[in-house]
């Protein structure tokens, strides 16, 4: 079984472009759930460029599946997570100047801080995931922090400019997923996945969940939000079924 986490950040981006109350990220999340989303992902960035603080509690109370909060490794974000108590937290690297998350968390470099955050979040019943590059040493370090989940960064695969590079990156993702599962980790993946490139990743049996946002929101402008979610989920399920 492959799960779909729908990232609703860019619904908030559209809302914030005009400073209005619409479109509502919460309404989008509820539509996504009815269309087959298994969880809702949102990223409260330090610059609040899309999701705002007020969105968190409303989202937590409204959705019926799981809330996956992406957050930077800062005390402010830890406090927010401990206040809202999402079911899941994914710790991600963050740079103010980037358009979107550009790479994986350096777990080896920030090991002690990550382990401390992980302990505090888990003490409140929150499942902790670390967003990392598909690298053996980062996976092993992630396991040693006490985190039970890793999310593999698929950006290099998604942005590959040639078939050979794409296949090389897919092999890295597949190998990393096997390493993670062998260590007892739950392995998720995401970043840059679209309707055109999702199936090879969804076919990797060791991967439990894919988190996808921009492609779904963009496609929703043409076909509607629920159909966009259903189409993505169908592609994922088809790929996993064919790989079985």
From Swiss-Prot:
Location relative to the cell: Cytoplasm
Binding site residues for 3-amino-2-oxopropyl phosphate: 7, 18, 192, 213-214
Top-level class of the enzyme under EC nomenclature: transferase
Transition state stabilizer, annotated site positions: 151
Active-site residue numbers: 43 (proton acceptor), 70 (proton acceptor), 191 (proton donor)
Catalytic activity: 3-amino-2-oxopropyl phosphate + 1-deoxy-D-xylulose 5-phosphate = pyridoxine 5'-phosphate + phosphate + 2 H2O + H(+)
GO function term, MF aspect, one: pyridoxine 5'-phosphate synthase activity
Cellular component per GO, a single term: cytosol
Superkingdom classification of source: Bacteria
Keyword list, A-Z: Cytoplasm, Pyridoxine biosynthesis, Transferase
EC id: 2.6.99.2
A Pfam family matched in the record: PdxJ
Pathway(s) this gene product operates in, as recorded in its UniProt entry: Cofactor biosynthesis; pyridoxine 5'-phosphate biosynthesis; pyridoxine 5'-phosphate from D-erythrose 4-phosphate: step 5/5
Annotated GO biological process: pyridoxine biosynthetic process
Binding site for 1-deoxy-D-xylulose 5-phosphate: 9-10, 45, 50, 100
Function, in words: Catalyzes the complicated ring closure reaction between the two acyclic compounds 1-deoxy-D-xylulose-5-phosphate (DXP) and 3-amino-2-oxopropyl phosphate (1-amino-acetone-3-phosphate or AAP) to form pyridoxine 5'-phosphate (PNP) and inorganic phosphate.
Family as reported in the entry's similarity comment: Belongs to the PNP synthase family.
Subunit: Homooctamer; tetramer of dimers.
PANTHER family for this protein: PYRIDOXINE 5'-PHOSPHATE SYNTHASE (PTHR30456:SF0)
Listed name of the protein: Pyridoxine 5'-phosphate synthase
